[in-house]
């Protein structure tokens, strides 16, 4: 009974929810064998043809390359690309690639030499003697990636499976309309394909190997059954035709009844899936020693006069392939890379063929039908019924259109396989897949930005923590240094303490005066002088405080100073224009100048020490001060311009000038030390000073007249 149940379960086929049955349109291209396409003159090889980062360049402009020669190095998840033919590297520059927006990616441009020479090839026909790691590394370095459309590096996928893979599934469903690349490959290369499957099984050591193929490929089914006639380790499962049965999650459920968990991978349930084209590429890499330089591409559509499947070299321009298939474009011709449901329209035809290019569809106007205008959603739920991932496309549409990223994520938009079934059945002609692609791209960009922000925050916090640790370490070092001084510092501290103790001991000793000697009062005298100096400093401080309290009007002072300067300039000009016969006694002039300066200083000090209520006009004071200075300069100039016959003893003149300056200083000090109650009226003082200057001037003129 258990054996019967196991046999029943072994051949059981499950069915997934949703799905559609569009017109297959496969007979246009699957009836002719695979053929080679003549070499193009120029090849454009993008460095990134897979999921992951691009490899490191190992060629330069001007290098000669052979077919199969690595153009980049593959390290980690970086998959290398290889030269599709022999020729010369003419440029390494960005070039538009197979993308809906024709985004430019760094590419190696090779001009073919027409010889198509291979590099030396080293095949491993005895691959069973090689270790698992060696085989995975060879597959990776030979550039093998998933050829079913995802482009995930095969070596990385095999390495990630490890020892937990129980079921190896070979995806031969090829469910999308028009595409027949896998169908034709299975018809023409079934034996090589099975050999590649055995290499994968040798690496993974699964418990069972399943080939899932739709029942609309009878010739391919017959070829595989013929090759597997003597094999018991590989099971061929024929499944009903339904779109999208070729989806990874859908085919896994159809063949095993297991569902891949949300956000997980098929390896989490012990399943690993590979495409038939990938298995064939593994065989050529391991046994033949040939890196992946070409793949099968379907050329179909009513605008192509010679449809079929061809071996297309990677990097071949799409235009070259279409011209070889006798492309007859119409006025508004559209060319789709991929199928009609999951493919995208090419913006121009000079983009190159890459590893994930499986079909070039050039439909006519009759095939496409009239373009339908997008209308409002009528909430019919037809999209939800057709969704094979059990999602709610209607809700995802509203969330995507309203930029509600959180709600779209909550409704598992990441599980959308972009099969296009919802858009196919939508009566309002809403391009739902386009909305979902854009929403997923925006969510990915937001997460990438959040990741960068989190990394920046982590770096900032790490830096702050490091600075705090360094600061704490410095403080700890300073504390340690303060607590434990060095030997040199200890000696200095001990010497200072000894000196202090010695001084204290001397201070406590009694003063002894010997007979016949005078006591040493130098310390007492020095202390008394210090106290006097301190008292004088305090008195000066107090005087400065009192002076600051009595502030004159600064505007009046400035005006008086300006008037004084003007009068002084006038006197200097008069002195310069005076007649030579008016000679002045230089000694008397010097004495008078000193007296005038002393009076001027006395007047300024009296003005500064005046009470606040007795304000002096600063303009008058400044004018008088300037007049006094001008008279002093005039007398000094007269002394300098004296006639030679009236020579003056310089020593006497210097003595007299010094006496005059001393008297002036004495007068200033007396004014400064005057009692506060003996205040002088600044106006009276200014008048007296002016009278004194006038009398001095008159006396000087009278003396000159008498001498004449």
UniProtKB/Swiss-Prot annotation:
Membrane topology, as annotated: Peripheral membrane protein
Binding locations of [4Fe-4S] cluster 2: 387, 416, 419, 422
Cofactor note: Binds 2 [4Fe-4S] clusters per subunit.
Residues reported to bind [4Fe-4S] cluster 1: 377, 380, 383, 426
Top enzyme class: translocase
GO MF, one annotated term: electron transfer activity
SUPFAM superfamilies linked: alpha-helical ferredoxin (SSF46548), Nqo1 FMN-binding domain-like (SSF142019)
Record's keyword terms, sorted: 4Fe-4S, Cell inner membrane, Cell membrane, Electron transport, Iron, Iron-sulfur, Membrane, Metal-binding, Repeat, Translocase, Transport
The protein's role, per its UniProt record: Part of a membrane-bound complex that couples electron transfer with translocation of ions across the membrane. Required to maintain the reduced state of SoxR.
Protein name: Ion-translocating oxidoreductase complex subunit C
Natural source organism: Shigella boydii serotype 18 (strain CDC 3083-94 / BS512)
